[in-house]
């Protein structure tokens, strides 16, 4: 009754409500969450952002379907209070926890840094697990307990730097005419220099041709100058903002 496609959750809650009710107690796991843009600390964090209201639609969906377990993911900003006209507004994370608890779920949540699993970026995410019949804390304990084993099985270091991740994609390894875009140069693979690169390339059959979707931009002189100014003047390890007057 539901096509495999993108759907508006509000429309599903309206048009397919009876179908959802028929699923009650039959679903093992619901995984997902609302869009992250409205909660991100890098964004505007507008209290009127309509996307943030999808949290309530999510709770309504869970209330109707009553899955045995659910996994909810969002940015770290989901746990940070919004500032409204009348002071701070409750963290959305606490709202979700309270509502799920009211629905009879046992709930646990953590901030997980995926860089600890050899992902080459410091990406902190709010992860929530809720269960009807089991302790959700067991999931996070298993995640922590198996971190080292996970990396070892994949042949990865506990931490992966950007250089270790993409040094084999540098332009100095060679270029060729892009096979799918005229007037652009594509990059060629360099030698594998890390466990991460070996893992990422394990299913690449022909590693002597152009890297898939790896085209070099044809920058104008103005953009090249801007990039050079940024490289020469921007402080390291700091986010660039308009206040820096570099753009």
Annotate each language-model stretch with its function.
Residues 1-69, 75-94:
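Core alpha/beta nucleotide-donor-binding catalytic domains of modification enzymes
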Residues 34, 74, 109-111, 154:
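A cross-domain feature marking catalytic cores of carbohydrate-active enzymes
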Residues 37-41, 78-81, 118-122, 135-139:
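Short catalytic/ligand-binding loop motif for oxyanion handling, primarily in non-cytosolic enzymes
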Residues 66-68, 105, 124:
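A short helix->loop->beta-strand "cap" motif at the edges of active sites that frequently abuts
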Residues 76, 105-116:
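Conserved S-adenosyl-L-methionine
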Residues 87-107:
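Conserved Class I S-adenosyl-L-methionine
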Residues 96, 112, 158:
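Internal, well-ordered alpha/beta segment that forms a basic, Gly-enriched binding/recognition surface
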Residues 125, 129-247:
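S-adenosyl-L-methionine-dependent DNA methyltransferase catalytic core
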């Amino acid at each position: 009754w539901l096509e495999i496609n993108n759907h508006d959750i509000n429309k599903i809650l309206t048009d397919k409500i009876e179908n959802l009710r028929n699923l009650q107690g039959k679903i093992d796991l619901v995984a997902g969450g609302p869009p992250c843009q409205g909660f991100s600390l890098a964004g505007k964090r507008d209290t009127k952002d309509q996307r943030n209201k999808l949290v309530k639609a999510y709770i309504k969906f869970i209330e109707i379907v009553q899955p045995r377990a659910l996994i909810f993911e969002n940015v770290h900003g989901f746990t940070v209070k919004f500032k409204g006209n009348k002071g701070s507004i409750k963290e959305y994370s606490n709202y979700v926890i309270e509502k799920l608890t009211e629905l009879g779920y046992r709930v646990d949540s953590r901030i997980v840094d995926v860089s600890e699993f050899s992902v080459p970026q410091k990406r902190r995410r709010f992860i929530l697990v809720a269960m009807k019949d089991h302790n959700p804390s067991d999931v996070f304990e298993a995640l922590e307990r198996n971190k080292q084993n996970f990396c070892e099985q994949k042949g990865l270091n506990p931490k992966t730097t950007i250089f270790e991740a993409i040094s084999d994609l540098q332009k100095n390894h060679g270029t060729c005419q892009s096979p799918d875009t005229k007037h652009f140069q594509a990059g060629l693979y360099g030698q594998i220099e890390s466990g991460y690169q070996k893992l990422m390339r394990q299913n690449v059959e022909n590693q002597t041709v152009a890297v898939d979707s790896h085209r070099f931009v044809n920058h104008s002189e103005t953009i090249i100058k801007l990039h050079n100014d940024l490289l020469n003047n921007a402080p390291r390890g700091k986010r660039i903002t308009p206040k820096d007057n570099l753009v």
